[in-house]
C-alpha cells in the first residue's frame, strides 16, 4: 500500500518548508494586520466612549447652566414685577394723597367762597332792608 521511500520524507520536508514560507510571507503579515485592525478598533471604541462620556457630561453641565439661567431670569422677572407693583402702589398712594389734598383745598376754597357769598348776601340784605324800611317809613331824620 504505502511505499516508504524518499518521497515521504521529502513531502514532509516540503510541507514544513511551505508552512514556514506561508507563515513568514502570509500568516505573520495577516496576523499583524488583524492585530493592528483590532487595536485600531479598540482605540477608536475607547475614544468614542470617552467622547460620548464627555459629551454627556457637557450636556448635563449645559442643562444645569440653562436651568440656573432660567431660575435667575425667573427671579429677575419676579423682582421686576415686585418692583413694578411697589412703584405702582407708591404712585397710586401719591395720586390719592394729591387728590385728597386737592379735595381739601377745594373744600377750603368753597368754604371761603361760601363765607364770602354769605357776607355779600348779608350786606345786600341789610341794604335792601334799609331801602324797604325807608320806602315804608319814609326818610328818617338824621340826628
Swiss-Prot record:
It is a single-pass membrane protein. InterPro entries: ATP_synth_b, ATP_synth_B-like_membr_sf, ATP_synth_b/b'su_bac/chlpt, ATP_synthase_B_chain. It comes from the Bacteria. One of its GO terms (molecular function) is proton-transporting ATPase activity, rotational mechanism. The keyword Nuclease does not apply. Its main location: membrane. It holds the Pfam family ATP-synt_B. Keywords: ATP synthesis, CF(0), Hydrogen ion transport, Ion transport, Membrane, Thylakoid, Transmembrane, Transmembrane helix, Transport. Coiled coil: none annotated. SUPFAM superfamilies: F1F0 ATP synthase subunit B, membrane domain. It is found in: Cellular thylakoid membrane. The chain crosses the membrane at residues 6-26. One of its GO terms (cellular component) is plasma membrane-derived thylakoid membrane. Belongs to the ATPase B chain family. F-type ATPases have 2 components, F(1) - the catalytic core - and F(0) - the membrane proton channel. F(1) has five subunits: alpha(3), beta(3), gamma(1), delta(1), epsilon(1). F(0) has four main subunits: a(1), b(1), b'(1) and c(10-14). The alpha and beta chains form an alternating ring which encloses part of the gamma chain. F(1) is attached to F(0) by a central stalk formed by the gamma and epsilon chains, while a peripheral stalk is formed by the delta, b and b' chains. F(1)F(0) ATP synthase produces ATP from ADP in the presence of a proton or sodium gradient. F-type ATPases consist of two structural domains, F(1) containing the extramembraneous catalytic core and F(0) containing the membrane proton channel, linked together by a central stalk and a peripheral stalk. During catalysis, ATP synthesis in the catalytic domain of F(1) is coupled via a rotary mechanism of the central stalk subunits to proton translocation. Component of the F(0) channel, it forms part of the peripheral stalk, linking F(1) to F(0). The b'-subunit is a diverged and duplicated form of b found in plants and photosynthetic bacteria. This is ATP synthase subunit b'. It comes from Nostoc punctiforme (strain ATCC 29133 / PCC 73102). The gene is atpF2.
Amino acid at each position: 500500500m504505502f511505499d516508504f521511500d524518499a518521497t515521504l520524507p521529502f513531502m514532509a520536508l516540503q510541507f514544513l518548508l511551505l508552512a514556514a514560507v506561508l507563515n513568514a510571507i502570509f500568516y505573520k503579515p495577516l496576523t499583524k494586520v488583524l492585530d493592528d485592525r483590532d487595536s485600531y478598533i479598540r482605540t477608536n471604541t475607547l475614544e468614542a466612549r470617552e467622547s460620548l462620556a464627555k459629551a454627556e457630561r457637557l450636556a448635563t453641565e449645559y442643562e444645569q447652566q440653562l436651568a440656573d439661567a432660567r431660575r435667575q431670569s425667573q427671579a429677575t422677572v419676579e423682582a421686576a414685577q415686585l418692583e413694578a407693583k411697589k412703584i405702582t402702589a407708591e404712585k397710586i398712594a401719591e395720586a390719592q394723597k394729591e387728590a385728597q389734598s386737592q379735595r381739601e383745598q377745594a373744600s377750603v376754597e368753597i368754604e371761603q367762597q361760601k363765607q364770602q357769598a354769605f357776607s355779600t348776601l348779608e350786606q345786600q340784605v341789610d341794604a335792601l332792608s334799609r331801602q324797604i324800611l325807608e320806602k315804608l317809613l319814609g326818610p328818617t331824620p338824621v340826628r
